């Protein structure tokens, strides 16, 4: 009987509590009250989620390295126009971040907010400098894109096909690099001769190598045979060879 009384009392309390929290659907909430109903943390976390997805789209190689193959055939353009576009996007992202009420965020999201703000401010500051004029680099330069392919995980024939498509698109970045460097030289931007000499040497070594020793072909030559039916790997190698020779 005691249990019944407690259970009954609890049920009555819940009924009154629920009734007190209900809002008449016919009542027209003001804009301010509507905004208060929406949890600031939910909106902020949605913002971060959208930022992450956009970042993967903007950095397809990074996405592939994480195992996300949604953008496995894409590359990031290194044209000056793309740098300008990215700078404007960063500024817009910061404006959207500043719209959140920091005080309404929980402790975890306050930390996320600070980190995101630092990241955006650093990226915007870096975008003020024309780094595209100084893209010659002994590591990670236009001549060593094959190293990116070496870091990827190949789990199927399609992964190799995707990399071949990426290589075909990368020809545009090679042309962009040439244009950017020439524009930079006209404006007085250039890397130290120590760097440029080493880069030229690296490029010469690739251009003067036998095709079977070309680092861009290595990925296809060493492809896992189990991913291919009869004749498919040979066809892939032939197409890769034609692409490399044409560039």
Model-derived segments and spans:
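Bacterial N-terminal signal peptides that target proteins for export
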Residues: 2-9
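C-terminal motif of bacterial Sec signal peptides marking the signal peptidase cleavage site
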Residues: 17-20
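N-terminal maturation segment of proteins
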Residues: 22-247
């Amino acid at each position: 009987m005691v249990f019944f009384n407690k259970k009954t009392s609890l049920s009555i309390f819940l009924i009154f509590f629920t009734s007190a929290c209900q809002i008449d659907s016919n009542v027209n909430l003001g804009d301010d009250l509507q905004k208060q109903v929406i949890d600031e943390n939910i909106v902020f976390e949605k913002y971060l989620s959208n930022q992450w997805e956009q970042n993967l789209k903007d950095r397809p190689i990074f996405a592939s390295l994480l195992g996300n193959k949604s953008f496995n055939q894409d590359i990031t353009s290194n044209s000056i126009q793309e740098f300008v576009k990215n700078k404007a996007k960063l500024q817009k992202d910061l404006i959207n971040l500043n719209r959140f009420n920091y005080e309404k965020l929980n402790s975890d999201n306050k930390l996320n907010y600070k980190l995101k703000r630092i990241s955006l401010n650093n990226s915007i500051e870096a975008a003020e400098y024309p780094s595209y004029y100084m893209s010659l680099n002994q590591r990670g330069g236009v001549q060593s894109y094959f190293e990116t392919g070496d870091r990827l995980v190949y789990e199927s024939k399609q992964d190799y096909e995707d990399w071949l498509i990426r290589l075909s698109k990368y020809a545009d970045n090679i042309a962009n690099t040439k244009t950017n460097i020439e524009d930079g030289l006209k404006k007085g931007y250039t890397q130290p001769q120590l760097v440029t000499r080493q880069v030229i040497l690296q490029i010469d070594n690739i251009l003067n190598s036998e095709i079977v020793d070309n680092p861009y072909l290595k990925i296809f030559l060493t492809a896992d045979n189990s991913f291919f039916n009869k004749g498919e790997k040979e066809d892939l190698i032939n197409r890769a060879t034609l692409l490399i020779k044409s560039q």
